[in-house]
């Protein structure tokens, strides 16, 4: 092959000789690197914990290390995607337009990215909008990394490779679950290594850990439903129970709700695909119900003091307050209602291009010491304007409709990923985007929009 490549005089000749397999293999490796980033951060925590530097130095080193690793993998992905797309353009100019016509969500996501560029240029603080804040690292630069992750995941067309990625993701999430539990139970060595706060694992805040575990739980549900080998189903069931226990210890109720609604949808997807009764969804529901019941009865200890009973009481009380007087229910959702109201007030002031990424600190810090509205849909509308939100919704809606119509022909990994996307979207109603959670939304989104007609053997 190398001798043939030396003789090439045009890009078309180079891409003709290479074919698609080298690109798919490279994309697979890059997606795996993305998925392993939390494990890398975990190793960093252990290293600095063993070295024994003070807490401030340790936090700085770990946060900087995670961001540098993400930048490295993101930059490699971005360069690879540029090379890949150049080849696609040279080889299949007409097919690209046909692809967008058949799968319009690609156009919506591209339009959202381009709109983000305009919003950044028109921002009052272009530097912060481009680079993001020191804490969240979620500016335009990271948006391009997310886009690269999406394309890389989309390139991985092989079902077995997709399953490997899902399995690795679930395994890393199980590792995070173990650390959350050991942190909350007061293990001295773990608390010496992981000093971000209680129930945070390798992330910066316990809620962010909940967003991540939410995806791991639904991924395991899907892997269990579509697995034929008994020993693997047993492993997935145990891991699922363990992660459910961990997310209740973590006590991020919005993420728990994401897992609950995603469980319902992923079971609907399963029966719509197989078109016959199967007992496996009942096992998933039983595991979810029993672990939740244990928490409700006080058998899942958590230092937060917020078990299932407390969370449900709070949910019903907040819902009642909102229905009675939404303007006065400012404490609903642990104060999120105030942030939602303020975010909604900001949208009409800059409805077209928004304020730009990461431009809420001045507005929200006067109300509460935060810089996000704790709702990613409101966040998109404020940052990118109403068109930016519509592009985002357009991608989600068109993908859902298109894939729903062809569900029987979809690969199992596409349906697993669709459940993970739903889990993320539900939890995002109460949460924030972070540089270490958003990439996995776009990874699963790419898998959910996967190829049809390639049944597994």
Regions found by a protein language model. Name each.
Residues 205, 307, 315-370, 377, ...:
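TM-adjacent membrane-interface loops and short helices in multi-pass inner/ER membrane proteins
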